[in-house]
């Protein structure tokens, strides 16, 4: 079983953190985030680090212990540096473009797919076959990237579709005569 929860989360330079009951708040160069820790986990600030402990030794408390520590670590990294996910588009005629605040995707459908980018997330299209999703909330960045990928996930025969940068697509062999 993982013991990641035992390790206190150091507050990085340039980030101010506060613990108010079960709410951990972090403020940095990129913005401000807060996380509400579950009641089964005790949170305290000591010596420039946030430490978490389970209130009892139940399975639920111990599982939320490590998750809470990781979530607190993620909000510190988010307000300091931010998070980024890159997507690649492959396929003939498949491309992306920004149209105001919306992302317009041509993915082989009879219509253009228009994705409304949520607040707090920035989407950039450096090339027509590349999409870069950035933001301070790791969960939201991953969710937006997954929603964009879901429109046309990579298929196993030719590899066409939207995939994460560096993602390995398991290819299949086609029919044989």
Swiss-Prot record:
<comment type="similarity">
    <text>Belongs to the universal ribosomal protein uL6 family.</text>
</comment>
<comment type="subunit">
    <text>Part of the 50S ribosomal subunit.</text>
</comment>
<dbReference type="GO" id="GO:0019843">
    <property type="term" value="F:rRNA binding"/>
</dbReference>
<keyword id="KW-0689">Ribosomal protein</keyword>
<dbReference type="GO" id="GO:0022625">
    <property type="term" value="C:cytosolic large ribosomal subunit"/>
</dbReference>
<dbReference type="InterPro" id="IPR002358">
    <property type="entry name" value="Ribosomal_uL6_CS"/>
</dbReference>
<dbReference type="InterPro" id="IPR036789">
    <property type="entry name" value="Ribosomal_uL6-like_a/b-dom_sf"/>
</dbReference>
<protein>
    <recommendedName>
        <fullName>Large ribosomal subunit protein uL6</fullName>
    </recommendedName>
</protein>
<dbReference type="InterPro" id="IPR019906">
    <property type="entry name" value="Ribosomal_uL6_bac-type"/>
</dbReference>
<dbReference type="GO" id="GO:0002181">
    <property type="term" value="P:cytoplasmic translation"/>
</dbReference>
<keyword id="KW-0687">Ribonucleoprotein</keyword>
<dbReference type="InterPro" id="IPR000702">
    <property type="entry name" value="Ribosomal_uL6-like"/>
</dbReference>
<keyword id="KW-0699">rRNA-binding</keyword>
<keyword id="KW-0694">RNA-binding</keyword>
<comment type="function">
    <text>This protein binds to the 23S rRNA, and is important in its secondary structure. It is located near the subunit interface in the base of the L7/L12 stalk, and near the tRNA binding site of the peptidyltransferase center.</text>
</comment>
<dbReference type="GO" id="GO:0003735">
    <property type="term" value="F:structural constituent of ribosome"/>
</dbReference>
<dbReference type="InterPro" id="IPR020040">
    <property type="entry name" value="Ribosomal_uL6_a/b-dom"/>
</dbReference>
<dbReference type="Pfam" id="PF00347">
    <property type="entry name" value="Ribosomal_L6"/>
</dbReference>
């Amino acid at each position: 079983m993982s013991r990641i929860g035992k390790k206190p989360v150091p507050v990085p330079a340039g980030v101010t953190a506060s613990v108010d009951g079960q709410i951990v708040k972090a403020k940095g160069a990129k913005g401000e985030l807060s996380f509400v820790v579950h009641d089964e986990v005790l949170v305290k600030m000591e010596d420039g680090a946030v430490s978490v402990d389970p209130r009892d030794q139940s399975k639920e408390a111990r599982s939320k212990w490590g998750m809470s520590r990781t979530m607190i670590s993620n909000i510190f990294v988010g307000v300091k540096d931010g998070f980024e996910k890159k997507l690649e588009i492959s396929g003939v005629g498949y491309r992306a473009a920004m149209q105001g605040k919306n992302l317009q995707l041509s993915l082989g459908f009879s219509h253009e797919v228009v994705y409304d980018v949520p607040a707090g997330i920035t989407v950039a299209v450096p090339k027509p076959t590349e999409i870069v999703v950035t933001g301070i909330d790791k969960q939201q960045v991953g969710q937006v990237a997954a929603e964009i990928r879901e429109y046309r996930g990579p298929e196993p025969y030719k590899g066409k579709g939207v995939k994460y940068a560096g993602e390995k697509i398991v290819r299949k062999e086609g029919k044989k005569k």
